[in-house]
């Protein structure tokens, strides 16, 4: 990481956290909840872990690489426009559109290669997850960690 930056240059990690979480119990037992869990499981089986199990290590990796002035912020990205707050509602709407437009692509390789599903099984599951993503009664959100740090001005 450090070798590609000039001294004093910054590196930032940000990622969409899976599995998603909920501010209440409305996510429990849904296809949306299952989707996040299965995506992480499939990625792990393919040797490419993803989601919060990776993003929780960003700070540690930056420290190990010698970065300084490391900062961290955690955001909540709603799964759809369920929040009452105007800004969060708009963010949720854009997030919902993003997920719906990419859902099949996100799932197909991971679920067929990582979990051994047939394409038809993925299609059925994607339809269920899509319905949950549109359901404003499910108060889900994706953790969105952002971690950044600076390459030292001089070598340690």
Language-model regions, residue ranges each:
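A short glycine-rich, Lys/Arg-flanked "PGG" loop and its adjoining helix->strand segment in the class I
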Residues: 1-10
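Conserved catalytic/acceptor-binding region of the Class I
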Residues: 10-101
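C-terminal lobe and adjacent flexible extensions of AdoMet/dcAdoMet transferase-like proteins
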Residues: 65-156
């Amino acid at each position: 990481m450090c070798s590609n930056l000039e001294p004093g240059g910054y590196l930032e990690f940000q990622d969409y956290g899976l599995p998603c979480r909920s501010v209440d119990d409305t996510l429990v037992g849904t296809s949306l909840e299952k989707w996040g869990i299965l995506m992480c499981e499939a990625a792990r089986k393919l040797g490419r872990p993803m989601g919060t199990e990776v993003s929780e290590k960003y700070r540690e990796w930056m420290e190990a690489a010698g970065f300084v002035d490391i900062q961290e912020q955690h955001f909540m990205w709603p799964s759809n426009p369920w929040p009452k707050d105007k800004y969060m509602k708009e963010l949720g709407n854009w997030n919902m559109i993003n997920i719906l437009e990419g859902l099949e692509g996100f799932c197909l390789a991971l679920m067929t290669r990582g979990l051994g599903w047939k394409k038809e099984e993925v299609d059925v599951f994607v339809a269920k997850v899509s319905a949950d993503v549109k359901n404003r009664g499910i108060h889900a959100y994706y953790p969105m960690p952002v971690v950044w740090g600076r390459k030292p001005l001089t070598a340690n």
